[in-house]
């Protein structure tokens, strides 16, 4: 008896006529976790903005700090600002892997995957501009604090950018390919594997295994090319 050929199915939205390979299935637990991480990220960004406002108030003299101490207070506020922004951005990126945005809405997809960068600019660019325009601080303090603020802006931006954004469509495609099976990945690899005996895993002393959703959460969103060939 001839083996039935597997039919590649395409899903069509009745209301819009748009096609796709089926919607991504995001569990209630993952949605809840993603929402919690996004809320925490926003709270941290608000606190980072408060740190920037504090630095601006010190810079303008509204919040009185002795001149000989002002540089240290300004740098301290910028460091706190940086830490809060980076932690918030990491949480936001983790949330995006648990519950990614769809590419069907290009605006939302862009905003969702660049919120950390936007927060970085908001939390550092104003203070950098004000420092460059300030004429009241002594030259040494102005130079040092401006350099610190500029470096903080660059670091916050680099840590906040998602260089490998995931879409709901990519998650759906991976779910369709893997189903309810187990996938495997390593600590430093960028791919997930369908075969635990894949030769690219043989030199790793520790191999993680889990669902495709857990692999995406770990930022392993690219299927191993060798495993994919073996599955064909």
Region spans (language model):
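Membrane-water interface of transmembrane alpha-helices
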Residues: 83-99
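Mature, structured domains enriched in cysteine- and short glycine motifs
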Residues: 158-232
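Membrane-anchoring hydrophobic segments
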Residues: 1-86
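Final/C-terminal transmembrane alpha-helix of multipass membrane proteins
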Residues: 146-161
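Juxtamembrane cytosolic interface motif at the C-terminal end of transmembrane helices
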Residues: 57-58, 89-93, 160
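Loop-to-transmembrane helix junctions at the membrane interface
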Residues: 71-74, 96-117
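Cytosolic-side transmembrane helix boundary signature
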Residues: 108-109, 113-150
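Membrane-interface helix-boundary motifs at transmembrane edges
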Residues: 64-69, 99-106, 135-143
């Amino acid at each position: 008896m001839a083996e039935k050929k597997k039919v590649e199915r395409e899903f069509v939205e009745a209301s819009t006529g748009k096609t796709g390979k089926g919607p991504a299935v995001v569990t209630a637990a993952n949605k809840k976790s993603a929402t919690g991480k996004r809320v925490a990220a926003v709270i941290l960004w608000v606190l980072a903005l408060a740190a920037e406002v504090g630095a601006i108030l010190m810079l303008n003299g509204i919040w009185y700090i002795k001149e000989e101490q002002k540089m240290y207070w300004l740098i301290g506020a910028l460091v706190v600002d940086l830490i809060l922004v980076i932690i918030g951005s990491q949480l936001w990126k983790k949330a995006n892997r648990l519950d990614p945005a769809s590419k069907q809405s290009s605006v939302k997809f862009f905003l969702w995957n660049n919120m950390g960068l936007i927060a970085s600019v908001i939390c550092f660019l104003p203070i950098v501009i004000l420092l460059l325009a300030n004429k009241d601080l002594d030259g040494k303090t102005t130079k040092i604090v401006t350099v610190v603020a500029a470096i903080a802006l660059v670091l916050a931006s680099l840590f906040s950018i998602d260089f490998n954004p995931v879409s709901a469509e990519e998650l759906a495609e991976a779910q369709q390919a893997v189903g309810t099976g187990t996938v495997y990945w390593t600590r430093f690899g960028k791919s997930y594997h369908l075969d635990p005996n894949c030769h690219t895993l043989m030199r790793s002393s520790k191999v993680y295994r889990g669902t495709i959703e857990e692999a995406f959460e770990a930022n392993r969103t690219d299927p191993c090319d060798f495993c994919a060939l073996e599955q064909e």
